[in-house]
Structures are given as C-alpha cells and as structure tokens.
Amino acid sequence: MNNGTSPAGGETEATQTRSGFVALIGAPNAGKSTLVNQLVGTKVSIVTHKVQTTRALVRGIFIEGPAQIVLVDTPGIFRPKRRLDRAMVTTAWGGAKDADIILVIIDAQGGFNENAEALLESMKDVRQKKVLVLNKVDRVDPPVLLSLAQKANELVPFDRTFMISALNGSGCKDLAKYLAESVPNGPWYYPEDQISDIPMRQLAAEITREKLYLRLHEELPYASTVETERWEERKDGSVRIEQVIYVERESQKKIVLGHKGETVKAIGQAARKEISEILEQTVHLFLFVKVRENWGNDPERYREMGLDFPT
C-alpha cells in the first residue's frame, strides 16, 4: 500500500505530511505479522502456523497519501513461562507504550476466549487511541462477528472497529486510510523508499527461522535461533550468506540436519529462494547447525534478536 509520494516543496495545508507509530497488539497467531506484510505490500515480518513466531519488534513502513505509517509488529501477548517468553512479552508492551495508535488484533475465528478477554482487560488503562481489529472474518458468520465486536467494545472504549482478513486483504484499505488520517501532522521518520528498519542480515536470519518453523514441529523451533554470521557481496553481483542455526542439545541438531542432511538442505533451499527474491540478487546460502547449551539464558543471543535480557 505504498501508494503515495512525498509532497514537493514547502508544506501547505493541502499537502501537510503526517507520520506516526502504530503498534499491533494481540495474542499469538492473531494475524499481526500477516497484517503488517499486507499493509506494507511485501514481507517484513515472518509468518507461520506456529504461535509465538515474532520475537522482537519489527517495524514495517507504508505510505498512504501524505502520511507515513510505521507499523510496530510486536510479539504475541501470552502468559510467559521461560526467560525468552518474558523478554518477548515485555518487548510487546514496550512497543505499545511508545505508539500513537494501538491496533488490538483479535482472531475472530477463535472468538471471545480467555486470551482475548485477558488482552482486552489489560487495555482498559491504556491512554493512546485504541482500534479494534477483528481478523479472519471471512471464516466467521456475520452475527457472530457483530456479537464479538459488541462484547469487546463494552469492555474497552475503542475509537473504531474494523473487520478484516489480513490474508486476502479484505478491509485493509479502509484500515490504511483511517490510520493515514489519524496519525499526527509531522515530517516522515524514514526515507520514502524504506519499508522496514530491520537490517537485511537480520531479515535473512528471520526468513531462515521461518523455514525452520515450517519444516519442523513440536517444541524444537522454540529451542532454536538463527544468526547471520557472514555477508559477502561478490564481484559478480551475487551475495554469499553464512548462517548458523543454534540448538540446545545434540539430539536437536540431528533433527535439524535430518537424514544425510536432507532437512537442513530443504530449509536452506526455501530460505535462499525467498532471500534472493527480496534482494533481487543471486544468493549463495550456507547453513551450519551448532549446539549451544542454554542459549536461551545467554544475554548476547537476546541482543542479536533485538530483545532486552530479563533479569
């Protein structure tokens, strides 16, 4: 939805620019990352069927008319069990605190469940403008949607309610227009052609982590992380990328490698294809799997992921 251009010359009343930060808050798998990618028009946040995919704040940027909207995709709000969980939830609330507008994303298909109710309760004292976004509405009957919207608005005084499908884009244009009209007047925060503030090295690692999530099941992906250790631009215009998949135990390493290395090879092929499409360059991707016990308690790993280490 980057369909605007920066106004030329001095600002007038008709062309005055707007800009602001919009945080997306919701339970895991509510569709926050899918919505960010839909509004931005390309992938800036990874999406899988697994919950708790987003770990750190990811900012996606789109332009709507004279407005530049910075979307802050936060980790899902849930009851933390591990140190990493605590860091993710703390980061999510931190992202909301600094935003001009908060989008509260609820999976309409999941209904008004315990997670949704707890999330709404926590939003009562939030002072920023709050917008309710019911996602996945294409899978729910209209009477159920209306009932869900009514219950949510009885708990929290939302400024607006939108019903969308982040996956197919239904309702997203209206949401984008509303955000563009609602962010404050002011200069743009980022250059016109920038769609994210995530470094390419980190995005490449996130893409590989996404393919790891999609390929493997159970708890293994949550005991793993991916880091880009080398990025070399080559004379022929291609790029050589070396990444390390860290796991906590030798048994997990065997699962990631697979029989004769077939699993990690498939992960690498899928990641290489997508990274190449984003860069519009030939990519030579090399994956290594290493055991690092208790990486989830290593402050350095948290810094790599853009998280504060919880004490």
Swiss-Prot record:
Please indicate if the UniProt record lists rRNA-binding as a keyword. yes
Q: What is its main location?
A: cytoplasm
Give a short account of what the protein does: An essential GTPase that binds both GDP and GTP, with rapid nucleotide exchange. Plays a role in 16S rRNA processing and 30S ribosomal subunit biogenesis and possibly also in cell cycle regulation and energy metabolism.
Q: Is rRNA-binding found in the keyword set?
A: yes
Q: Where is this region: G5?
A: 164-166
Q: What is this protein called?
A: GTPase Era
Kindly state one GO CC term assigned in the UniProt record: plasma membrane
Quaternary assembly: Monomer.
Which parts of the sequence belong to the KH type-2 domain? 216-293
Q: Which region ranges are annotated with the description G2? A: 52-56
Cell location: Cytoplasm; Cell inner membrane
Q: Which organism is it from?
A: Brucella suis biovar 1 (strain 1330)
Q: Which gene encodes it?
A: era
